[in-house]
Amino acid sequence: KNCKIKKMIYLSSSTIYQKNHFIGINKLKAEKHLIKNKLKFKYLQIWRPFNLIGSNQTQLTDHFHNYLFKVIFLEKRKFVLFNGNESDKRGYSSIDEFVKILQKYSSKNKSFINNFGNPNLISVKDIISIYNRVSNKKLGFELNHKFKSKKFNINSVKNLNKRKNIYSKTKSEHVIEHF
């Protein structure tokens, strides 16, 4: 209760910008609690990363690239009906790149809220093409697919003007190819 912390670094999530997203709602509550109690810290640093991918990932999340990987390479399914639209776009960043930037900025003695993401977007259709090239080579088949939605969604750090944005310098396509 009476503990004085010099620097609090909180890893939040870009899901705080989405309506009714379970993780986003809880991450935002945590952010608000930290901000309300910021006098307990000399410096408060909040990070909101977008679509991070690690090459040594052992757990698959519910993100599209992970779901697609699971469907093609683990389940070896030949057809999938997706909820979204093939024109949906995302900006992917490497966890390794994010960690380097996090270390650099976190060493500064100042408070901030930063978004981290990749303004270089890749479409869901292009992600499927990349995975299909690999599956064709390694498994001898490509995934056939359809999408339910006519409306497309663009999830980009570039759409945010509210806070400081720090951008990945790597193309999303390159990040996906090295997943």
Regions found by a protein language model. Give the residues of each.
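Short aromatic-enriched loop/helix-cap "lid" or pocket-rim segments at secondary-structure transitions
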Residues: F22-I23, Q57-D62, D126-S129, N153-N155
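PG/GG-rich flexible active-site loop of Rossmann-like NAD(P)H-dependent oxidoreductases
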Residues: T15, N51, L121
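Short catalytic/ligand-binding loop motif for oxyanion handling, primarily in non-cytosolic enzymes
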Residues: Y17-K19, S55, S123
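Short, electropositive alpha-helical surface patch
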Residues: F22-A30, R133
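Short beta-strand/turn micro-motifs composed of small residues
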Residues: S12, R48, G117
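C-terminal substrate-binding subdomain of Rossmann-fold SDR/epimerase-dehydratase oxidoreductases
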Residues: K76-F179
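Conserved Rossmann-fold NAD(P)-dependent oxidoreductase catalytic core, especially the SDR/UDP-sugar
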Residues: K1-I25, K40, L44-Q45
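NAD(P)-dependent short-chain dehydrogenase/reductase
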Residues: L28, K32-G91, I95-Q103
